[in-house]
Amino acid sequence: MNTRWQQAGQKVKPGFKLAGKLVLLTALRYGPAGVAGWAIKSVARRPLKMLLAVALEPLLSRAANKLAQRYKR
């Protein structure tokens, strides 16, 4: 029975690898703005919302670019 699971894992592994790459690319493409939007919606106080709107998205964009550079090679 163990060999069946190993064989199934070998067949499924390339699909998971492709799906993981697609998820990573989508997250890097739309992630910073989406995460910043979620953070802004979850904060109730208006001054803090404005501060997050100005500061959070550029920081997340820089982090996403650094992550993309690491996996670009």
Swiss-Prot record:
Gene Ontology cellular component annotations, sorted alphabetically: cytoplasm; plasma membrane
Subcellular location: Cytoplasm; Cell inner membrane
Keywords assigned by UniProt, alphabetized: Cell inner membrane, Cell membrane, Cytoplasm, Membrane, Stress response
Induction line: By heat, ethanol, osmotic shock and infection by filamentous bacteriophages.
Protein's membrane topology: Peripheral membrane protein
Domain of life the protein comes from: Bacteria
Functional note: The phage shock protein (psp) operon (pspABCDE) may play a significant role in the competition for survival under nutrient- or energy-limited conditions.
Protein name according to UniProt: Phage shock protein D
Gene giving rise to this polypeptide: pspD
